[in-house]
């Protein structure tokens, strides 16, 4: 019989995704067939699953941790926030439409069938399924029709473990408050809790555990330390960009403008892992740094709206100065579209303006189209003559003179564009920096010897380290019961 557990947070960004990934790897290391599941995710960091649809990147990573192929059924409902039209709704890997907040609330009861169907498919043949909630079950204003937290848990009969983040402060109040606000039915689903992101001597929290037990009756299943290895994993949400270290004094500075609807910014993680590379995420209201050698414009869920914001920030002028100083630019997906001379949206797919002038750094134009490209890809760098692996998730077709200097060949077809002087390039291929040979050649073009490490092996090793830490700190009785 398949064992099931669900981690729900007392709030967003408490570390549920990493804990699920770590538990998946721990179970896999014990020889179990384990699978992750998240009923509903909201993220513009999407991945292409092994069965060819869109899922949250966190669930893709959790499948990697579990050593199983990723599937659209591991994240049956994915919400991708965009501009005035609200969020794009992806159901079982395919775009099902767009919805604003109230519209989506009305849709949720109808989505529960898809969620339960996917959960049954994921559970089939597994020893253990580890489910991740979204946000907090204490948001009782959203409880009616809920499919992400207690609504799912009660329907599927999955016991819940709450996760509280002690690093942000107020963890006792958040757990006790969640207990107080839950209905009797929902409260009965909770079997205990985990304290996450603890720094220092855990015995200093013994009185805290006793207090929580007094107010709630819930046992503590473990106090998890700050997991340093998690810093080597792809980040799920753009909220982490607020606190990423900027470092200094590195050989190569790479500036990344943080777009309002930034997507798939984990493209930068392999570069950030290089010891001689400093990634500077440039927040709105801050100019692009003068001393950056490379500017990377990342993906966007709403190219036209983000291009308007780009200009409002004055980044277009900063980029022109960067080019005049001899700097280089790489645009990925939506960033590639922005680099052209024009972006048109005749069908209003993005929900805003129908046409906008591009940054004019590539002689190409993009037309948005309803057909969405979603696929994993093997590619060839025509620029450096090395193999690439990545994925495509985009709307729109791009064409123009500079496409004749396409820097990438994907499955036999040319992709992207490059300026005549070779200093500006764009591509639809996500993940190119994660290809070790490409990253090495890119760094070499800046006079840096790097890219010698295997990024994917580094991620895999980090998962093993997290699993080992969880094995050491979690309550033995609870853990052995979970893992059988």
Swiss-Prot record:
<dbReference type="InterPro" id="IPR004459">
    <property type="entry name" value="CobQ_synth"/>
</dbReference>
<dbReference type="InterPro" id="IPR029062">
    <property type="entry name" value="Class_I_gatase-like"/>
</dbReference>
<dbReference type="Pfam" id="PF01656">
    <property type="entry name" value="CbiA"/>
</dbReference>
<protein>
    <recommendedName>
        <fullName>Cobyric acid synthase</fullName>
    </recommendedName>
</protein>
<keyword id="KW-0315">Glutamine amidotransferase</keyword>
<feature type="active site">
    <location>
        <position position="430"/>
    </location>
</feature>
<dbReference type="Pfam" id="PF07685">
    <property type="entry name" value="GATase_3"/>
</dbReference>
<dbReference type="InterPro" id="IPR033949">
    <property type="entry name" value="CobQ_GATase1"/>
</dbReference>
<dbReference type="GO" id="GO:0009236">
    <property type="term" value="P:cobalamin biosynthetic process"/>
</dbReference>
<comment type="similarity">
    <text>Belongs to the CobB/CobQ family. CobQ subfamily.</text>
</comment>
<comment type="pathway">
    <text>Cofactor biosynthesis; adenosylcobalamin biosynthesis.</text>
</comment>
<feature type="domain" description="GATase cobBQ-type">
    <location>
        <begin position="251"/>
        <end position="438"/>
    </location>
</feature>
<dbReference type="InterPro" id="IPR002586">
    <property type="entry name" value="CobQ/CobB/MinD/ParA_Nub-bd_dom"/>
</dbReference>
<dbReference type="GO" id="GO:0015420">
    <property type="term" value="F:ABC-type vitamin B12 transporter activity"/>
</dbReference>
<dbReference type="InterPro" id="IPR047045">
    <property type="entry name" value="CobQ_N"/>
</dbReference>
<feature type="active site" description="Nucleophile">
    <location>
        <position position="333"/>
    </location>
</feature>
<keyword id="KW-0169">Cobalamin biosynthesis</keyword>
<dbReference type="InterPro" id="IPR011698">
    <property type="entry name" value="GATase_3"/>
</dbReference>
<dbReference type="GO" id="GO:0003824">
    <property type="term" value="F:catalytic activity"/>
</dbReference>
<comment type="function">
    <text>Catalyzes amidations at positions B, D, E, and G on adenosylcobyrinic A,C-diamide. NH(2) groups are provided by glutamine, and one molecule of ATP is hydrogenolyzed for each amidation.</text>
</comment>
<dbReference type="InterPro" id="IPR027417">
    <property type="entry name" value="P-loop_NTPase"/>
</dbReference>
């Amino acid at each position: 019989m398949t064992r099931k557990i669900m981690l729900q947070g007392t709030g967003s960004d408490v570390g549920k995704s990493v804990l699920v990934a770590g538990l998946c790897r721990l179970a896999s290391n014990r020889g179990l067939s384990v699978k992750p599941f998240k009923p509903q995710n909201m993220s513009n960091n999407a991945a292409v699953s092994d069965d060819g649809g869109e899922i949250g990147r966190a669930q893709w990573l959790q499948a990697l941790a579990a050593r199983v192929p990723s599937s659209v059924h591991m994240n049956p409902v994915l919400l991708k926030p965009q501009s005035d039209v609200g969020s794009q709704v992806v159901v079982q890997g395919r775009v099902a439409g767009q919805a604003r907040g109230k519209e989506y609330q009305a849709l949720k009861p109808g989505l529960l069938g898809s969620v339960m169907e996917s959960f049954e498919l994921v559970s089939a043949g597994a020893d253990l399924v580890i489910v991740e909630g979204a946000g907090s079950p204490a948001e009782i204003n959203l409880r009616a029709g809920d499919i992400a937290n207690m609504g799912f848990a009660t329907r599927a009969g999955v016991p819940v473990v709450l996760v509280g983040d002690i690093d942000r402060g107020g963890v006792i109040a958040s757990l006790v408050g969640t207990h107080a606000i839950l209905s009797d039915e929902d409260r009965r689903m909770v079997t205990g809790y985990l304290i996450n992101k603890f720094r220092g001597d855990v015995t200093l929290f013994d009185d805290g555990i006793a207090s929580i037990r007094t107010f709630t009756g819930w046992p503590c299943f473990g106090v998890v330390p700050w997991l340093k290895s998690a810093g080597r994993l792809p980040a799920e949400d753009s909220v982490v960009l607020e606190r990423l270290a900027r470092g200094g004094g590195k050989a190569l500075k790479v500036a990344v403008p943080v777009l309002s609807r930034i997507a798939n910014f984990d493209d930068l993680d392999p570069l950030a892992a290089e010891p001689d590379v400093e990634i500077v995420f440039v927040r709105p209201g801050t100019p692009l740094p003068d001393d950056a050698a490379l500017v990377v414009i990342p993906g966007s869920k709403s190219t036209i709206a983000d291009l308007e914001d780009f200009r409002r920030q004055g980044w277009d002028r900063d980029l022109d100065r960067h080019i005049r100083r001899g700097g280089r630019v790489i645009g990925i997906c939506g960033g590639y579209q922005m680099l052209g001379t024009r972006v048109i949206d005749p069908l209003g797919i993005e929900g805003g303006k129908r046409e906008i002038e591009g940054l004019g750094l590539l002689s190409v134009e993009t037309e948005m189209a309803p057909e969405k490209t979603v696929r994993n890809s093997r590619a060839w760098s025509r620029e450096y003559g090395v193999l690439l692996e990545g994925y495509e998730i985009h709307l729109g077709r791009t064409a123009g003179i500079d496409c004749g200097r396409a820097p990438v060949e994907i499955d036999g077809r040319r992709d992207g564009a490059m300026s005549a002087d070779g200093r500006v390039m764009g591509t639809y291929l996500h993940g190119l920096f994660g290809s070790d040979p490409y990253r090495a050649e890119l760094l070499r073009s800046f006079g840096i010897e790097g890219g010698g490490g295997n990024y994917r092996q580094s991620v895999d090793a980090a998962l093993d380290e997290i699993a080992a830490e969880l094995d050491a700190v979690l309550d033995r009785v609870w853990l052995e019961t979970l893992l059988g």
